[in-house]
C-alpha cells in the first residue's frame, strides 16, 4: 500500500486501526494460551471428565525434556563455535523459552563494536541463518530418539536485548532492541513478574517503577537516585486514594470478631475493611456510606499510630475503603506516608537493586569523605 498519497486524517485513522488490530490479535493469542494452560491443568484435576494423571505427567515431562534438550544442544553449539570447552551460555530458561548469551560471539566476530544497531542486525542474521536451522535439526533428532509420530516442536527467536536482570524465577527485565522482527530505535522494556505489571500496585507507582527500571537499564546510579528523591517529594503530596494498595476483600465473616473487630492473623486488606465497617457503624454514617461487602474491590493504606480508627488501644495501623473515603474520617492526617512510600515503591525497587548494588539515596562513605 502506498501511504505517501494519503491525507493526514487517513494516516491517523489507519494508525488507530492498526493499534486496535494489534491489541485485538494480542488478546486472541492470550486467550488461546490461557485455554491451553487450562486444558492442561484440567487433565490433572480428578473432577474433570477426561482426568488422566499419565497424560498430565506426560505433558509436564515432555516439556521439561524438550527445553533441557535444546538448552544442552545450544551450549554444545556455542562452545564448538567459540572453542570454549564447557561454558554455560544459557543464562536462564523457562517452560518454553531459553535465554542465550552472545557476548563472547560478538567480541569474536565484531571486536570493540558498540553500535547497537549493527550488533542487533548481526544477531538477527546469524540466528535466522544458523541457529534456527540448528534448533529445528536438534528437535528432529529428539523426535527420533523418542520415536514420536510427528515432530511438533518448533522454536523461533523472540527478543534481542542488550541487558537482562532476573530477581527470581519468572521475574525479570529485558532491555529489548528487537522483538520478533520489530525494531526499536530506543530500547523497549520487557517486564515479567515485577510490580510494574501487577494490578495490586497503585497505578501511579507502577508508572514510576517502570521509569525507574528504564533508568536502571539505560542510565547511571546518580540519575536514578535523583529521580527517586524527586518522586518521593511528589508522592508525599498525593491523596490517600491515589497511593493506596488495590485489593479484593474475601473472608469478612471468617475474620470478624465482635469484641476486637478482627481476629488474629487477619489479612491486612480484610483487617482494614473490618476497621472501616466498624467506624461507619460507630460514627453512624451507615445512611451515607455503604459498608464494605464480601468480594468487593477496595484500597488500603497504612496509618500512623495511635489513631482514632481501631480499637481502644489505637494501635491498628491500617484502614481500607471503597471508591470514596468518607470525609468525616479526616484520614489525611493519619496516613503514614513514609511507610506507604516504602511498601508501595521502595520495597519492589529494592528487590531489583540488591542484584546490582545500587541505592535509592546518596550515602556518605569513607571514600566520599576524602574525595
What are the residue ranges of the model-derived segments?
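Short, conserved non-catalytic motifs in the polymerase core
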Residues: 46-58
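Function-dense linear segments that define catalytic or interfacial modules
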Residues: 35, 39-42
